[in-house]
Amino acid sequence: MWTSWWLWPLVAVCTADSFLDQAVQILRVTPVIDGHNDLPWQLLNKFNNRLQDSRANLTVLADTHTNIPKLRAGFVGGQFWSAYTPCDTQNKDTVRRTLEQMDVVHRMCQLYPETFLCVTDSAGIQQAFREGKVASLIGVEGGHSIDSSLGVLRALYRLGMRYLTLTHNCNTPWADNWLVDRGDDEAQSGGLSVFGQRVVREMNRLGVMIDLAHVSVATMKAALQLSTAPVIFSHSSAFTVCAHKRNVPDDVLQLVKETGSLVMVNFYNDYVSCASEATLSQVADHLDYIKNVAGAAAVRFGGDFDGVTRLPVGLEDVSKYPDLVAELLRRGWTEAEVRGALAENLLRVFREVEQVSNQAQVPEEEPISLEQLGGSCRTQYGYSEAPSLHRRPGALLASLSLLLLSLGLL
């Protein structure tokens, strides 16, 4: 399919493992598109986003899960880089910090043009494959990054965001996060508020993939039922295999199957084995389970490299993808199923999201109400009326009547 991949440095496979040999042959033709990598966050923490610092050189960077030699060795041909800002930025400087992390991805492409090609659509991914480069896309991790603004959502799209995780480890004013299911946060939106539904519709209109990693089960179901395009879980695993609330339960996996959506398995030990230690084989157990419940077309990889502190034995960094593919082949996965998990399932969903988008359609314009927002550092104009006034149309008129009576004008 993408024949120029033979130009990449060949991986020496000094082993009698025929499954690993086969895995390498598959990866040379169909490289992996990983759904979630937090290298930009590491570049912020270690170098304050100074990419020209000699220590930040991605050809030699040693203390991260990701660098250019590791990407090459792992046959990573596409990567959704995470533009992540922590929840403590919500109602503060989250938009600024999100823009800075998106800028890091663009500068990576500028500094290493022989390796990275920043793209924004499915055709761009295939172009990068043909050129033997890593297709570099941006996923914004956390709905708080749009600061409850449809205008910010649209602006981030124009700057390259192609998926938005509806929450991180905190509620937004319009969507509930997974900690609600654990009892650590209170449900505020019942999944998605009215404004949250507007966000989903606008993402469909724009062609932004809806990412349900980190959200509550109620939010998962609400978004899956509302979205007119398939959705993704960019870095989540199977709840039945490991009963962690960040993972996807069986009834949601059924909705994933019905909607043609994707679950990109996370490699974080705590989500893989529900313990501090895990193995590559246990990651394959999650992939097997999702394939059996939701179908092979639903399976993907979302390693969460450089975003987690513990990774399975055998999957220590991005170079280890050939070993994971070999394990799937060893378990009887067909070559077509493997190619789907590597890239083709994602390309299918991306194309469907692009087909559903209709930017000629009138954009969502109704802003959120000021009463629904947290924080005190906000101006008072440009918001909707409180939802209670929308539910009771006579409330505003009654309030005005009381005011006029008090002034003796009625």
Swiss-Prot record:
It is found in: Apical cell membrane; Cell projection, Microvillus membrane. CDD domains: rDP_like. Zn(2+) 2 binds at E141, H214, H235. It holds the Pfam family Peptidase_M19. Its EC number is 3.4.13.19, 3.5.2.6. Inhibited by L-penicillamine. Beta-lactamase activity is inhibited by cilastatin. It catalyses: an L-aminoacyl-L-amino acid + H2O = 2 an L-alpha-amino acid; leukotriene D4 + H2O = leukotriene E4 + glycine; L-cystine-bis-glycine + 2 H2O = L-cystine + 2 glycine; a beta-lactam + H2O = a substituted beta-amino acid. Homodimer; disulfide-linked. Belongs to the metallo-dependent hydrolases superfamily. Peptidase M19 family. This is Dipeptidase 1. It comes from Oryctolagus cuniculus. The gene is DPEP1.
